[in-house]
Swiss-Prot record:
Biological processes per GO annotation: 'de novo' CTP biosynthetic process; pyrimidine nucleobase biosynthetic process
Full protein name: CTP synthase
Binding site for CTP: S14, D149, I150, E151, K189, T190, K191, P192, T193, Q194, K225
Positions bound to L-glutamine: Y55, G355, L383, G384, M385, Q386, E406, R463
Keyword set includes Ligase: yes
Name of the gene: pyrG
Organism: Acetivibrio thermocellus (strain ATCC 27405 / DSM 1237 / JCM 9322 / NBRC 103400 / NCIMB 10682 / NRRL B-4536 / VPI 7372) (Clostridium thermocellum)
InterPro entries attached to this UniProt entry: Class_I_gatase-like, CTP_synthase, CTP_synthase_N, GATASE, GATase1_CTP_Synthase, P-loop_NTPase
Stated role: Catalyzes the ATP-dependent amination of UTP to CTP with either L-glutamine or ammonia as the source of nitrogen. Regulates intracellular CTP levels through interactions with the four ribonucleotide triphosphates.
Region (Amidoligase domain): 1-268
Annotated family: Belongs to the CTP synthase family.
């Protein structure tokens, strides 16, 4: 069977959920026995989002091979349960970087380098490349941005050409649009969708399927109207209603018949999907019997997308433990000695995620101190681990001026320091310790109990590490170095003695958690938090 290509575009406004639509369709096709991969094209000129502010871009998702990518790749991996690579996220910056490099080498033999054919050919090559990896049956490609954006034009022209290259029978175009509801008149308005499709058709792309984001159900008459004006059957107009949980959306789109239409259009046969596991997952999530509160202490808390994978991983752990996880967003810049007790006294666990820069670090250190002293389950990820080490050094080991050299280059006790191989690097983009690395776990540790393995592989994104000059002192005071790199030069996991659950990790476990396979650390962190909550309730009742 030849590879099939599905392109997902968006219209009217951004943020409609193209990524979730693509991920959900991927899940539905995989449930039909097809081998699926998903790809995202981002029209911005940055080579990758690694140096972009979380306020502008949200989370940076890291793949096994060390690519810093769009957060939608996290959705893709969680929904289709496959590990993606650097080839699954392509930006305008990457495209132009590649073309200019080729031009400088003389690869174009003196020709004039133009958007068509050179840029469009480079884009198409990236599409075909993922289709050749892993014996893929279906490639789903999401085009970032909105139809009408000047930045998207080369990508739209490239996907138009794909139909000519591989045959129109092997391509499906899906357009995601907004059907707004006017509460005053009680009407759903289709005109924005009509104009968006008109714009897309003016570029040579006739959508096969239109997915309508809406807060109210679409009647058959309304679907037929959209179909009439957009030149498709009314049955191929799909409603995508607001949902309480992201994981309901594949089931809602299955009910609408999206995957069946795609299979019919691509001649993939009519195979009944096996959605048993997914249905059970959603059913469990809807019927959780317990609840708990986790404080997420960070500096980007105004934009929840900055910690998207962490939040999803907490939810995965909650579903596994039959507990609804309520997140208390705590701005680390505003956390002080004066409000520490008041802010954290009602939480069942504290999580300090990764980050960069000195803003808000003292608040994170205070959160680690509160967790240590009050026996509250503490989970430190990347910077969260480093701040736990700084707190321990200051308040347990007596190194009052301890700090990370990232924040205080003149600290007399830099218990966290720049990795040696990073010291001669001037460029910021793509130069950190990135991607999957092994870690050896000592047997007599909580980490070994949780992982049930002496060797694990986790994804990393950092420049700074535990300073080995302080190993002996800090371990003598009760810090456990539970996980090390195979060379034993890098500290990967720290724990505390005499604490119910206090673990810091240099890596990012949130990037490997899946709804059907929660990450072991998140599973056990939530277990410990649930245990603490219900023990406290029992003590109050006594």
């Amino acid at each position: 069977m030849s590879v099939k290509y599905i392109f997902v575009t968006g219209g009217v406004v951004s943020g409609l959920g193209k990524g979730i639509t693509a991920a959900s369709l991927g899940r539905l096709l995989k449930a039909r026995g097809l081998r699926v991969t998903i790809q995202k094209f981002d029209p911005y000129i940055n080579v990758d989002p690694g140096t972009m502010s979380p306020y502008q871009h949200g989370e940076v998702f890291v793949t096994d091979d060390g690519a810093e990518t769009d957060l939608d790749l996290g959705h893709y991996e969680r929904f289709i349960d496959e590990n993606l690579s650097k080839n699954n996220n392509v930006t305008t910056g990457k495209i132009y970087w590649s073309i200019i490099s080729k031009e400088r080498k003389g690869d174009f033999l003196g020709g004039t380098v133009q958007v068509i054919p050179h840029v469009t050919n480079e884009i198409k090559n990236r599409i075909y490349l993922v289709g050749k990896e892993g014996k893929t049956d279906v490639v789903i490609t999401e085009i970032g941005g909105t139809v009408g954006d000047i930045e998207s034009l080369p990508f739209l022209e490239a996907i138009r050409q794909v139909a000519s290259d591989v045959g129109r029978e092997n391509v499906v175009y899906i357009h995601v649009t907004l059907v707004p509801y006017l509460s005053k008149s009680g009407e759903l308005k289709t005109k924005p969708t009509q104009h968006s499709v008109k714009e897309l058709r003016s570029l040579g792309i006739q959508p096969d399927i239109i997915v309508c984001r809406t807060e109210k159900r679409l009647s058959k008459e309304l679907k037929d109207k959209i179909g009439l004006f957009c030149n498709i059957p009314g049955e191929w107009v799909i409603q995508n209603l607001d949902a309480e949980s992201l994981y309901e959306i594949p089931l809602m789109l299955e009910e609408e018949g999206l995957a069946n239409i795609v299979c019919e259009r691509l001649n993939l046969g009519c195979v009944k999907p096996d959605m048993t596991e997914w249905c059970e997952l959603v059913n469990r999530q809807k019927n959780l019997s317990k609840s708990l509160t986790i404080a997420l202490v960070g500096k980007y808390v105004e934009l929840h997308d900055a910690y998207l994978s962490v939040v999803e991983s907490l939810n995965h752990g909650g579903i596994y433990n039959d507990a609804e996880v309520k997140i208390k967003w705590v701005n680390s810049e505003e956390l002080t000695e004066d409000n520490l007790e008041e802010t954290l006294c009602d939480v069942d666990g504290i999580l300090v995620p990764g980050g960069f820069g000195d803003r808000g670090i003292e608040g994170k250190i205070l959160a680690a101190k509160y967790a240590r002293e009050n026996k509250v389950p503490y989970f430190g990820i990347c910077l969260g681990m480093q701040m736990a080490v700084v707190e321990f050094a200051r308040n347990v080991a007596g190194l009052k001026m301890a700090n990370s050299s990232e924040f205080d280059a003149n600290s007399p006790h830099p218990v966290i320091d720049l990795m040696p191989e990073q010291k001669d690097i001037d460029e910021k983009g793509g130069t950190m310790r990135l991607g999957l690395y092994p870690c050896k776990i000592i047997k007599d540790s909580s980490a070994y109990r949780i992982y049930e393995s002496e060797l694990i592989y986790e994804r990393h994104r950092h420049r700074y590490e535990f300073n080995n000059e302080y190993r002996e002192l800090l371990t003598s005071k009760g810090l456990i170095l539970a996980g090390l790199s195979p060379s034993e030069k890098l500290v990967e996991i720290i724990e505390l003695k005499d604490h119910p659950w206090f673990i810091g990790v240099q890596f990012h476990p949130e990037f490997k958690s899946r709804p059907n396979r929660p990450h072991p650390l998140f599973k056990d962190f939530i277990r410990a938090a649930v245990e603490r909550r219900y023990k406290q309730q029992e003590n109050k009742n006594d």
